[in-house]
UniProtKB/Swiss-Prot annotation:
Basic residues bias locations: 623-640
Keyword Cytoplasm: yes
UniProt-recorded name of the protein: Signal recognition particle subunit SRP72
Assembly mode: Component of a fungal signal recognition particle (SRP) complex that consists of a 7SL RNA molecule (scR1) and at least six protein subunits: SRP72, SRP68, SRP54, SEC65, SRP21 and SRP14. At least SRP14, SRP21, SRP68 and SRP72 are proposed to get assembled together with scR1 RNA as a pre-SRP complex in the nucleolus which is exported to the cytoplasm.
Length: 640
């Protein structure tokens, strides 16, 4: 692939020189600027272009500071070059300040005007948006540029690649607007980008097929950097389908070819360690962090990695440091803020029991939700629910999830976001585990109100609302389920969902059609992945924690049974007769006790009655002398 996707944007500068010639142009321009030339704006622009062609962006920034007086006076004439420098150096504040100064209108207004002079600015803006995670804006700009290329200002292949790049991360954007550029299998760049989309939607076999074609094309042209990039993506997709041996073989081969301190090598090392099952008790995390070369990783930023790559690397490092009991400081990311609170609440992440951790986080998260559901509340909530599920405290997990939704929907249902959708997914699963159909009905009713308030904006999260539609169907509410799924099918302009179409259609589904729908499902593989078959509530394991409500019901039932036993005991008894006040004393110690005549009292019982014969037997003074044996002793003769 090309080093950047801005080919022909800077072609208007009319500089097509070698590396040494670019350096000579740079030196000549600097001398002219120092001597005070007549047209400093044009000379300074040529100087910036020569430095950009050499990929010396820090040096370009140095010249912007050195010749600030020229920048202040003629800055609008080389605004494109300045934006490109800020984009490559990952300077978002400077980039946004300059961009808003150039384009004062909102994006939709600018795209409607279709100003030809802003085409280069929009290209750089789209690249910046993709690199910083603004995928929706990047996709919108790329689609506009691709659909307004009648004069062939840009390469059609590059526009096709650029349009597909945001979809590799945010595939749901295709639901709002289909692709405007066709697929051309002659370009391995386009095959590579298309494989990302296939992998994102779970079509891994198709992704592998496209990657193998792209790898063959890159090998034929001999671009080693592109070959390594395609191999890395191929190893990832092979790992996703369970072909770990092939994936490891590719990664090990890449590590042998690449330099140890290169960013590409560090990504391969991270992916190879993803196959290892770490233990928070036995793993030496200090050694692992050193092997991953985390210090070197932290020297890179978005200049080297994309937004998604950089986020994944930082998340992995945060997890390793958390289980290494290293202090984690709260930063911009949701995960770092969550781990910061978690490490403060828990004394020792690796040694403290999950039960204690779940109890601490449950009380803390409850207070946090009551004070507000915005910010990083969703992070600490998900961590709390995970710990509660590990300890099988299902009711507490349900209770805290419902509290989050109730507080979020306290004022209105209009502010529905991804955090609420995630909690709804979790609650549906927990309701299924506990068999709480009534609670599921209440949640579905609230989601119906949310759907009304959204006023047709459900296309922003079609997978979630499709899930809600099938949950309605499982509860027997076929009318609302069909209405929701019919609305979803109108938004789905891409691949048709056969199952949704069957539910929406009024035709009945016979046995043969049902068999065709499930013919390709691998049951054994689903069971291996942890999917449990449907079973009745009577067969479910009852070894679950008893909630407070269930405990109260059990106590009330015991109390009723006790009352019935007492009523049965009192039948045929004189209730007016008072109980014996000495009933707590032993029988022989009571004043009413009278022993039988022939019964001999116990000799060692304190306070026991004793007859006369027994007393005489114990009187030592009346005993006679012991009898003496008067028979002489026979003396045995000894042996001589």
């Amino acid at each position: 692939m090309a080093k950047d996707n801005l080919t022909n944007l800077l072609s208007q500068l009319n500089i097509q020189l070698s590396q040494d010639e670019h350096s000579q142009v740079e030196q000549t321009c600097v001398k002219l600027l120092d001597s005070g030339c007549e047209n400093p704006a044009d000379v300074f622009r040529r100087c910036l272009v020569a430095v950009i062609q050499q990929d010396k962006y820090q040096k370009a920034l140095h010249y912007l500071k050195k010749f600030k007086h020229i920048d202040d006076k003629y800055g609008r004439k080389f605004a494109l070059e300045k934006l490109y420098i800020f984009y490559k150096l990952n300077m978002p504040d400077e980039f946004n300040t300059l961009y808003t100064a150039i384009i004062t209108d909102d994006l939709d207004t600018v795209l409607k005007k279709d100003i030809e002079s802003l085409r280069g600015i929009l290209h750089v803006r789209a690249q910046y948006c993709y690199k910083n995670g603004l995928y929706q804006e990047a996709f919108k700009i790329y689609q506009h540029l691709a659909s307004h290329n009648e004069k062939d200002q840009d390469s059609q292949i590059e526009l096709s690649c650029n349009e597909r790049v945001p979809l590799s991360v945010a595939t749901e954007l295709m639901n709002r607007s289909p692709l405007v550029t066709p697929m051309d299998e002659s370009s391995y760049d386009l095959l590579f980008n298309e494989s990302f989309i296939m992998a994102s939607v779970g079509k891994y076999d198709k992704a592998i097929e496209l990657l193998e074609k792209a790898l063959q094309g890159a090998t034929n042209e001999g671009y080693q950097n592109d070959i390594n990039t395609i191999k890395l993506q191929l190893s990832f997709v092979l790992q996703m389908v369970g072909k770990t041996a092939q994936s490891k073989e590719i990664l090990k081969g890449l590590l042998q070819e690449l330099k140890a301190d290169s960013p590409f090598s560090l990504i391969c090392q991270n992916n190879l360690n993803a196959f290892v099952d770490f233990s928070k008790y036995n793993t030496n995390f200090n050694l692992l962090l050193r092997e991953l070369n985390v210090e070197k990783l932290n020297t890179f930023n978005l200049q080297t990695f994309t937004h998604e790559q950089w986020s994944n690397i930082q998340r992995n490092v945060l997890f390793l440091r958390l289980f290494n009991n290293v202090k984690i400081h709260s930063q911009e990311s949701l995960l770092s803020r969550t781990f910061d609170k978690y490490s403060k609440l828990v004394d020792n992440v690796t040694l403290e029991s999950y039960k204690t951790q779940a109890k601490k986080l449950y009380h803390h998260t409850t207070k946090t939700i009551l004070s507000g559901t915005d910010g990083s509340t969703i992070g600490i909530l998900l961590l709390t629910i995970q710990l509660l599920i590990i300890e099988k405290e299902w009711e507490n997990a349900i209770r805290i999830g419902e509290l989050f939704l109730n507080e979020s929907w306290k004022s209105s249902f209009e502010k529905f976001n991804d955090s609420q959708a995630i909690v709804c997914y979790i609650l549906f699963e927990l309701y299924k585990i506990k068999g709480r159909n009534n609670s599921k009905s209440v949640l579905l009713k609230k989601l119906g109100s949310v759907r009304v308030q959204l006023s047709g904006k459900i296309q922003e999260n079609i997978p979630f609302w499709k899930h809600v539609g099938f949950e309605l169907l499982s509860m027997g509410n076929a009318k609302e389920s069909k209405a929701l799924l019919r609305e979803i099918s109108n938004f789905s302009k891409g691949d048709a969902d056969v199952l949704v179409d069957r539910v929406v259609s009024s035709d009945s589904l016979d046995i043969a059609q049902g068999i065709d729908l499930v013919r390709d499902i691998d049951i054994d593989k689903l069971i291996q992945l942890g999917v449990k078959p449907l079973e009745s509530s009577a067969k479910r394991s009852k070894n679950t924690a008893v909630s407070k409500v269930q405990k109260r019901k059990v106590l009330e039932l015991k109390k009723k049974r006790k009352i019935k036993r007492l009523e049965k005991f009192l039948q045929g008894r004189d209730t007016s007769k008072l109980p014996d006040p000495e009933r707590w004393l032993p029988l022989r110690d009571r004043s009413t006790y009278r022993p039988k005549k022939k019964q001999q009292g116990a000799k060692q019982t304190q306070g026991g009655a004793m007859n006369k014969k027994s007393e005489q037997a114990l009187d030592i003074s009346k005993k006679g002398k012991p009898t003496v044996n008067k028979k002489p002793k026979n003396k045995k003769k000894g042996r001589k």
